[in-house]
From Swiss-Prot:
Pfam families: Peptidase_M50
Region (Disordered): 63-133
Gene assigned in the entry: EGY2
Keyword tags: Chloroplast, Hydrolase, Membrane, Metalloprotease, Plastid, Protease, Transit peptide, Transmembrane, Transmembrane helix
GO CC entries: chloroplast; chloroplast membrane; chloroplast thylakoid membrane
PANTHER family the UniProt entry points to: ZINC METALLOPROTEASE EGY1, ZINC METALLOPROTEASE EGY2, CHLOROPLASTIC-RELATED
Regions that span the bilayer: 267-287, 311-331, 336-356, 374-394, 437-457, 484-504, 527-547
Species classification: Eukaryota, Viridiplantae, Streptophyta, Embryophyta, Tracheophyta
Presequence range in chain numbering: 1-64
The name this protein goes by in its record: Probable zinc metalloprotease EGY2, chloroplastic
Residue ranges of coiled coil: none
Function: Probable membrane-associated metalloprotease that may be involved in chloroplast development.
Chloroplast in keyword set: yes
E.C. designation(s): 3.4.24.-
Membrane-related topology note: Multi-pass membrane protein
Organism of derivation: Arabidopsis thaliana
Length: 556
């Protein structure tokens, strides 16, 4: 099994505004400072009147809230550039009516008016910088604030509270667009083109940009042309993906910074965790081949002969699993695919569930993934079948071997069919048969390879299905396989644990490939289908009774 780290998320982030600030205007590249200008005002009162008249004069103060200038993060239109040139000349937009109901007016005591005047006059001409808390660097926010004058005193405390409530509220801007606009323009104008991929629209995607459009020519050829042009313009700074949009099954191109693809480091070293899992898996392999240890684990310390008896079976099964992983490693190295250390998963029923191996880099295309995924099961099936046949032909060394009931061969269509073909009438219902233990040990290896080849999630079979039929079909097969295993779990403990393993560790999705559109060559597709077929033969039961009439079905 190979574990790698893809679903599309092309949703735009929503620009949310403070609920108490209805006059927010987003104007990029505004000047970095602002001033509050206060003037003199006159006020008249008629204290004896039933209705106290308050005369307010409104003066607009432009408070420009800026942040450190950084690269623009988004797929801005040409209006962005025009706004930069005209923002210094054009007057700010004024929305006076909506602010009246939102502003806070503080009634100051008459005795504090002179103190307030002195306090506010000292603020006149000072520069006020307010942090907006926006998660989107490079966007400068202009806030139009109406400062309300009352009774020759400016209600500055209310305005300051208003500024604070507006500016301290984080602006939920789209943080997924991290490519500068200049980079996007180069990608659209110089990297993509009529001869490769004609871009019609673009959307944010996982720290980069997703380009929709029309693919020209063969996907593999177009990908290489686009990749070469992008490397000529940006070097190794960005990574290109040519994928299929699951929404409409049309090709899309995705460009993301390579720094966003760096794997996360773990607190526990990989080799240490893999070694720990390997020791536990080796112990469970001993347990499976020594029934006495299953009932009394402490007896192993008193009688080492028990461990000696279980050593051959553990080594044979481990050999089949090791050849399986060796097949993955050899093919991956030939294709330049880096694999992590295998994590052997222990099992109380069959000794081990096989190994989980992480793919550490991006696979180039579906054919490469198919080769790596199919190499392990093909190697494991080949060795397992050879050992299984040897066990059926070679009699037990002690003349007794392992005595089993003939019904045990109903557990596997492949094992039952081969046994009936080679043993003939010696294999009959209701009778016991003496076998070479190598048959049972090799059968365990075949079963582990067969379950790993189920077309589900990130199992080898899941990767094979993805490589042959694409991501959407592989997802459907994963659901069907988990459902069938769930039904089988009602009758088999092994199926139950495999459902748990797949659902929590190997459910997927499979990490995106660099180019997912090109279908693999027919000869590799045939090998992949052969692996899936062998998995089906190993896991399905043998339905025919072991009698002289081979056409007789069990229970009929």
């Amino acid at each position: 099994m190979n574990l790698a780290v893809a679903s599309f998320r092309g949703n735009f982030g929503v620009l949310s505004q403070c609920s108490s600030c209805c006059s927010l205007q987003f104007q990029p590249f505004v000047a970095a400072t602002s001033s509050l200008n206060f003037g003199q005002t006159g006020t008249s009162r008629r204290k004896k009147d039933l209705k106290l008249e308050r005369v307010f004069r409104k003066r607009e103060t432009l408070v420009r809230v800026t942040e450190t200038q950084t690269e623009p993060e988004g797929n801005d239109d040409e209006d962005n550039k025009e706004g930069k040139e005209s923002s210094a000349d054009d007057p700010p937009t004024k929305i006076p009516t909506e602010l009246n109901s939102q502003s806070t007016v503080v009634n100051e005591a008459p005795g504090n008016e002179e103190e307030n005047k002195a306090q506010f006059s000292s603020q006149d001409g000072d520069k006020l910088e307010v942090s907006s808390g926006s998660p989107l660097p490079g966007v400068n926010v202009s806030i139009i604030i109406h400062v309300i004058y009352k009774d020759d005193s400016i209600m500055f405390s209310g305005c300051l509270s208003f500024i604070k409530s507006c500016c301290e509220q984080p602006l939920q801007l789209d943080d997924s667009m991290r490519l500068p606009k200049e980079t996007i323009d180069i990608l659209r104008g110089q990297v993509f083109g009529f001869d490769t991929f004609f871009v019609t629209s673009q959307e944010p995607y996982e720290g980069g940009v997703l380009f929709k459009g029309n693919l020209r020519g063969k996907p593999a050829t177009s990908y290489e042309k686009i990749k070469t042009r992008m490397e000529n313009n940006f070097g190794d700074q960005y990574k290109l993906f040519l994928l299929t949009n699951p929404e409409d099954d049309k090709p899309v191109a995705v460009v993301v910074p390579r720094r966003s693809l760096e794997p996360e480091t773990t607190a526990v070293p990989e080799w240490f965790a893999a070694g720990s899992f390997g020791l536990v898996a080796l112990f469970t392999l001993f347990l499976r081949n020594v029934p006495a240890l299953q009932s009394d684990l402490l007896s192993a310390f008193d009688n080492l002969e028990l461990l000696k008896d279980g050593l051959p079976g553990a080594l044979v099964t481990a050999l089949v699993l090791g050849v399986h992983e060796l097949g993955h490693i050899l093919v991956a190295n030939s294709l330049g695919i880096k694999l992590g250390v295998p994590f052997f998963v222990p099992s109380w029923q069959i000794g081990s569930f096989g190994a989980i191996t992480r793919i550490k880099n991006i696979v180039a295309k579906r054919e490469d993934l198919l080769k790596v995924a199919a190499a392990g099961p093909l190697a494991g099936f080949s060795l397992g079948l050879i050992l299984f046949l040897i066990g059926l032909f070679v009699p037990p060394s002690d003349g007794i071997g392992v005595v089993v009931d003939a019904s045990v061969f109903h557990e596997s269509f492949l094992a039952g069919g081969i046994a009936k073909l080679l043993l003939g009438d010696a294999l009959k219902e209701g009778t016991s048969i003496s076998l070479n233990p190598l048959v049972i040990w090799a059968w365990a290896g075949l079963l582990i390879n067969g379950i790993n080849s189920i077309p589900a999630g990130e199992l080898d079979g899941g990767k094979i299905a993805f490589s042959i039929w694409g991501r959407k079909t592989a997802t459907r097969l994963t659901g069907a396989s988990i459902a069938l295993l769930g039904l089988s779990a009602l009758f088999s403990d092994v199926a139950f644990y495999w459902v748990v393993l797949i659902f929590f560790l190997q459910r997927g999705p499979i990490a995106p490939l660099a180019e997912e559109i090109t279908v693999p060559d027919d000869k590799y597709v045939s090998l992949g289908i052969l692996v899936l077929f062998l998995s089906l033969l190993v896991c399905l039961p043998y339905p025919f009774a072991f009698t002289g009439n081979e056409a007789m079905m069990i229970g009929l």
